[in-house]
């Protein structure tokens, strides 16, 4: 669902995509994956990633997209963004969810992305992600004043 929304953003305003993938991966079973996510959240774990962005200095605008796990982004997203310098960047959070909206993600993004201008976030119901192109496109363009 999140990937679909990220692709809608790219189609609407351009840019590069970077997929956050953990070294160990997550279970494809929903209940097992949920349990893994909960354990990571409760332990404030930062899972190792297959790849990291080293530098975002060439970008002015960063869309941070992810599913809502335990009321915020997956801990793997934090593994990535906590090491980046967001000073002077525009950050647009998007979260796919199944009922929790943006959860605490805006507070977390504000805390982590020091020096950034945090724009209004967008919550997309996961079950409706494939039908959300118009809403995602409108939000992405408005976020960039395009």
Range-by-range predicted roles:
Residues 75-78, 106-107:
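Short amphipathic alpha-helical segments
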Residues 64-65, 93:
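Redox-cofactor binding/interface segments in oxidoreductases and associated redox assembly factors
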Residues 1-64, 71, 78, 82, ...:
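N-terminal beta1-alpha1-beta2 submodule of the flavodoxin-like/Rossmannoid cofactor-binding fold
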Residues 92-131:
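Short, glycine-/small-residue-rich phosphate/pyrophosphate-handling segment
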Residues 14-16, 90, 117:
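Residues at the starts of beta-strands that form the adenosine-phosphate
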Residues 67-70, 98-99:
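Short beta->alpha junction loops/turns
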Residues 73-74, 102:
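Alpha-helix N-cap/helix-start motif
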Residues 56, 82-88, 112-113:
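Short, conserved loop/helix-junction motifs that constitute active-site signature segments
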């Amino acid at each position: 669902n999140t990937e679909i929304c990220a692709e809608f953003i790219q189609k609407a305003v351009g840019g590069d995509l970077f997929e956050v993938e953990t070294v160990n991966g997550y279970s494809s079973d929903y209940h097992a994956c949920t349990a893994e996510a909960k354990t990571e959240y409760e332990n404030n774990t930062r899972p190792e990633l297959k790849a990291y962005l080293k530098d975002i200095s060439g970008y002015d605008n960063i869309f941070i997209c992810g599913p809502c796990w335990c009321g915020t982004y997956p801990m793997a997203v934090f593994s990535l963004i906590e090491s980046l310098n967001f000073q002077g960047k525009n950050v647009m959070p998007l979260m796919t969810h199944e009922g929790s909206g943006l959860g605490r993600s805006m507070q977390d993004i504000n805390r982590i992305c020091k020096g950034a201008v945090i724009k209004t976030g967008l919550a997309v119901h996961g079950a409706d992600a494939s039908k959300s192109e118009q809403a995602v496109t409108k939000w992405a363009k408005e976020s960039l004043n395009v």
